[in-house]
């Protein structure tokens, strides 16, 4: 795959998808849109790919959103295309941002501004790691351009309706500290280190058994916002799909026989991220 406006890099079981237009604050145009679809399709379908990390080239921008100079080239512009877009049959305006069926983990390494469609792409991820100089905002509010790549749906799910509506309606830009305080960002790291931290986390996630991890993500994504009874039905369906997997049988064996690094030291399971005194 030869790309000109993104970079697609394989690092063991991790795939880095990088917006690569630093001279234009990594904004997304028609070529970027097509290349993003190709890269995300490869990640989704590649059995060896376990985690994706999305980031931006340079040190100024994750992505400033859509390339407004491209104008109508990014948009559905005839009745059939508009109807297909309304039915959810188009992948998104700025790449496959409307896809909801990637159940492999996705980490955003936010290395600068994440504005408008860039914010929407940050929300596409499951985990967001932001550099201390990063900022976030629905800056397209000034130009009378709406959110079309999941922002109106994902942002409220991440930070709650009240906070999301303030950002969506006003277009106010927030810094990394506020983003962390309201739950938009999971972790803040020094400038220039978000990709390294994301790769460290991706490497750890890649060591975990994958089947139940993915069905748990699927259950959370599909069940969110539904009535509790329906969400529990989805959870049961996903659980029953993974519980008899060979990885589960092996995991139970390792637990019973203490044949795992987390079961060999003091007899108690070790919880990642918790330091024992």
What are these regions (language model features)?
Residues 1-62, 72-74, 277:
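Conserved CoA-thioester-binding segment of acyl-CoA-metabolizing enzymes
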Residues 3, 46, 65, 103, ...:
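Acidic-histidine catalytic/liganding microenvironments
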Residues 17, 21, 36, 54, ...:
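Terminal peptide-recognition signature
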Residues 33-37, 41, 45, 68-111, ...:
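An acidic, glycine-rich surface segment that forms the CoA-thioester-binding/catalytic face
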Residues 40, 62, 136, 255, ...:
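Conserved hydrophobic/aromatic "anchor" residues
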Residues 59-63, 69, 115, 137, ...:
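Short, active-site-adjacent cap segments at secondary-structure transitions
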Residues 97-213:
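Crotonase-fold acyl-CoA enzyme core
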Residues 129-134, 185-237, 241, 246, ...:
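C-terminal long alpha-helix characteristic of the crotonase
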């Amino acid at each position: 795959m030869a790309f000109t406006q993104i970079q697609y890099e394989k690092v063991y079981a991790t795939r880095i998808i990088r917006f690569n237009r630093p001279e234009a604050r990594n904004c997304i145009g028609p070529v970027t849109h097509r290349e993003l679809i190709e890269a995300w399709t490869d990640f989704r379908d590649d059995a060896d790919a376990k985690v994706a990390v999305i980031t931006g080239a340079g040190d100024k921008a994750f992505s400033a959103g859509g390339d407004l100079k491209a104008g109508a080239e990014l948009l559905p512009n005839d009745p059939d295309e508009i109807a297909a877009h309304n039915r959810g049959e188009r992948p998104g305006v700025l790449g496959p941002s409307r896809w909801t069926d990637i159940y492999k983990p996705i980490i955003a390494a936010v290395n600068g501004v994440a504005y408008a469609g860039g914010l929407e792409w940050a929300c596409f991820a499951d985990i967001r790691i932001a550099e201390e100089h990063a900022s976030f905002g629905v800056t397209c509010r000034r130009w009378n351009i709406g959110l079309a790549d999941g922002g109106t749906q994902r942002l409220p799910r991440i930070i709650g309706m009240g906070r999301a509506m303030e950002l969506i309606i006003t277009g106010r830009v927030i810094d990394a500290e506020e983003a962390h305080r309201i739950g938009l960002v999971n972790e803040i790291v020094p400038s220039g280190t978000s990709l390294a931290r994301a790769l460290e986390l991706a490497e750890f996630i890649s060591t975990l058994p994958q089947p139940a991890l993915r069905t748990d993500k699927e259950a959370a994504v599909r069940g969110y916002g539904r009535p509790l009874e329906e969400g529990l039905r989805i959870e049961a369906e996903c659980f029953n799909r993974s519980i008899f997997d060979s990885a589960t049988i092996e995991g139970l064996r390792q637990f019973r026989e203490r044949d795992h690094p987390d079961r060999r030291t003091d007899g108690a399971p070790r919880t990642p991220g918790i330091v024992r005194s």
